[in-house]
From Swiss-Prot:
Heterodimer of a B chain and an A chain linked by two disulfide bonds. It comes from Canis lupus familiaris. The gene is INSL3. Seems to play a role in testicular function. May be a trophic hormone with a role in testicular descent in fetal life. Is a ligand for LGR8 receptor. The lineage of its organism: Eukaryota, Metazoa, Chordata, Craniata, Vertebrata. Disulfide bonds join C36-C117, C48-C130, C116-C121. GO terms for biological process: adenylate cyclase-inhibiting G protein-coupled receptor signaling pathway. More strongly expressed in testis than in ovary. Transmembrane segments: none annotated. Residues 1-24 form the signal peptide. This is Insulin-like 3. InterPro entries: INSL3/INSL4, Insulin-like, Insulin-like_sf, Insulin_CS. Keywords: Cleavage on pair of basic residues, Disulfide bond, Hormone, Secreted, Signal.
Amino acid sequence: MSPRPLAWALVLLGAALAVALALGSAPAPGAREKLCGHHFVRALVRVCGGPRWSSEDGRRVAGGDRELLQWLEGRHLHGQVSDGDPMLVLVPQALPQASLHHHHRRAAATNPAHYCCLSGCSRQDLLTLCPH
């Protein structure tokens, strides 16, 4: 076998291998990815693309991750509820020890950041969390 066809065969094999690796390593569009802490926040900012959360020129946005986490935890609503109607203010009540575990599990299920960390979130899941 002459060196010329062998060289072409190696070039074609290398190109095919590169394409196969590129396609194999790309996550599927609906794939779930475990996102914890700042990885969750950054993925949410990237998906939502809000001008208050991501800057075009790379400058850090005032409030940054802290503002987004507070929004996700619903802290922005606490003052509004107590100012509007005193009957709506929730008074914490002691839970019996037996139901404490179930309460924690139920709270974790409703916290999107905790859910994405434990079970993973798809891009579509993150889009449902966008405020706009």
